[in-house]
Amino acid sequence: MVIDKSKLFVLEKNSLFSGILFLGLLLAYYSTLYPWPLWPIAGHVETVAGFVLLLAFIFKPHNENTILTRNDFLLAVLLYATLEVYQRLVGNSNVVRFMSIPFHVVIFMILFRLDKEVLPRLMQFITKFMAIIELPAIFFFILYIFGFPLPYTDASYDNEFYFFTNYYFFLIDDRFLTWLFPRFQAYFVEPNHNGCACVFLLFYQCGKWKKWYNIVLLTSVLLSFSLTAYVLLVVVMFLNLWRKRKRFLLKIIIPITIIGSVIGGSFLYNDGNNLVHDLILIRLEVEDGDIAGNNRVTKNFEHDFDRFLKSDDILFGRKRDMTEFGNSGYKVYIYEKGFVGLFLLIAFYVAATYKARNMRSLLSAWLMATLYFISNGEITWFQIFIPTYCAAYALPPETPEEEKDNEADEKSLKSIET
């Protein structure tokens, strides 16, 4: 048997090319999650990711036409570049921040050029990697809860804006050190970041929640005690049923019963002195006509935002007082970027996703992005955008065979090999 070595060489280069592309996108994904191992280069991780993606083209075979197949990316890339330049201008960014824009654009351009059949493979890679690093974090966190002594060091981030006890596999915010059961945040700066990132990965994993990696992610969400993550998780449960055109009524009886039992039990158990009641339910109580947990902005900022809406700064935004802690969400984004920034953001999202193959997947992705924007305001963060973008182009599984994990991988691999 004669083996054509030239074909083997092309296949190896193709595999290396796609592998480096995935590695660069994985690095971009974590660049906005700020895991502590990347703190030494915080603010430059996206630049490194963009450089890695450019480096991949050294290994690109001349006849490669199966991974970067899309040519309808120009409008979305131009809108993103415009949005980035605009945000830097209104934010009075320094020269270094402007110099990083081309590398950010490279990340989005590569993502938008990926063939739609390759997106499931990318998401499988990111999801499993997240589960692999979350698993030991959860294990050692549970040991910590039970009082096992673990090595640690003190740590701070963002010019000592955050202070942590770093147990290497997980961080404990110093504000939670006295809690009997602190909120789980894995390697990241906030429990909310960890919980929401896992929820958006689960959002893409429609119909596959019984897989080991999704069980790990679900456990991480529950341990985060993030109200935003919990609300998004419930929304994802219903969206998954809607995307698959399943009947709602019978499917929601069991989860509603479980949620109702947990809520009722939390008020009765130990006279309400328990984790579920103190960390979640008490934040859903209505105080002065508003939900207690709706604390994304302070009262001072709320008054300032009302004055802003009546000012001449409404179009291009105004500089915010950064000394005040605890403000985030859509109001902060509009305050800082103005309604011009909001328009550019919406236009970018629409341009990036409007060619989705399934209307329900597209609407679900837009809804998830909107809900996160209301709460956190930063929907161009890669841990939010990449799963949302891929989910918009996903096809809901219609048969058990289509729900198998390997199908998307096998299709992509076969197309690469040919």
Predicted regions and their residues:
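N-terminal signal-anchor transmembrane segment
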Residues: 1-63, 80-87, 367-373, 382-389
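TM-adjacent membrane-interface loops and short helices in multi-pass inner/ER membrane proteins
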Residues: 289-325, 339-343
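Flexible juxtamembrane loops connecting transmembrane helices in multi-pass membrane enzymes
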Residues: 262-302, 320
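Hydrophobic transmembrane alpha-helices and their immediate junctions
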Residues: 234-240, 250-253, 336-373, 391-395
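Transmembrane alpha-helical segments and their membrane-water interfaces
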Residues: 55-60, 87-143, 345-351
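Helix-loop-helix junctions and helix-breaking kinks within/between transmembrane helices
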Residues: 35-45, 86-101, 188-196, 213-241, ...
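Transmembrane alpha-helices of multi-pass inner-membrane enzymes
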Residues: 50-55, 365-370, 378-418
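Alpha-helical transmembrane segments of multi-pass inner-membrane proteins
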Residues: 124-148, 172-225, 230-242
